[in-house]
């Protein structure tokens, strides 16, 4: 069975109430004037960078217990729903490959500004990606969460295969659902 944009949206919406922050993180990669094979390689490098940044970010959430997210990820690792955008050939030289990420299960004492500082350090300094990051608390986002999910999956609505291809929009390997933390509410 091939996934559709609706299937992915439905999956994301199961965890909508647990999402506290939405984040856009641009990479250093620009698909302009590159072949599909080159763009796929850039996307794979981007996904590796995101995996590394998410691990660094997760550890920074618990500075006195940085091993929490590796020893007990089902409780302490942040909820992460990720999509990747601009992984197609383009004539727009300004476009970058970037991630749209919904986060949850973050320590409640952290402000949006503090979360941004921690993620920016992990993404820009540690993973050596672009400093172009935008983060907002879901209560401050100008639209409801359902519209955010529609926005981050807009490429799958334009090109159906992006919903189910392994090099498609949904970055499954960088998604994480901390079931024990979610079920303890």
Each language-model region and where it sits:
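Right-hand nucleic-acid polymerase module
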Residues: 1-97, 105-185
């Amino acid at each position: 069975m091939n996934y559709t944009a609706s299937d992915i949206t439905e999956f994301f919406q199961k965890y909508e109430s647990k999402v506290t922050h939405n984040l856009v993180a641009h990479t250093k990669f620009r698909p302009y004037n590159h072949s599909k094979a080159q763009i796929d390689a850039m996307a794979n490098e981007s996904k590796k960078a995101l995996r590394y940044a998410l691990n660094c970010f997760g550890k920074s959430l618990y500075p006195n217990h940085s091993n929490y997210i590796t020893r007990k990820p089902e409780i302490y690792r942040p909820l992460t729903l990720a999509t990747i955008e601009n992984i197609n050939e383009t004539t727009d030289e300004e476009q970058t490959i970037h991630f749209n990420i919904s986060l949850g299960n973050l320590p409640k004492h952290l402000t949006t500004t503090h979360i941004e500082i921690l993620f920016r350090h992990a993404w820009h300094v540690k993973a050596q990606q672009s400093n172009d990051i935008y983060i907002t608390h879901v209560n401050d986002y100008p639209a409801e969460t359902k519209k955010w999910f529609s926005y981050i999956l807009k490429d799958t609505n334009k090109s159906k295969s992006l919903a189910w291809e392994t090099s498609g929009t949904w970055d499954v390997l960088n998604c994480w659902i901390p079931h024990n933390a979610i079920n303890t509410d």
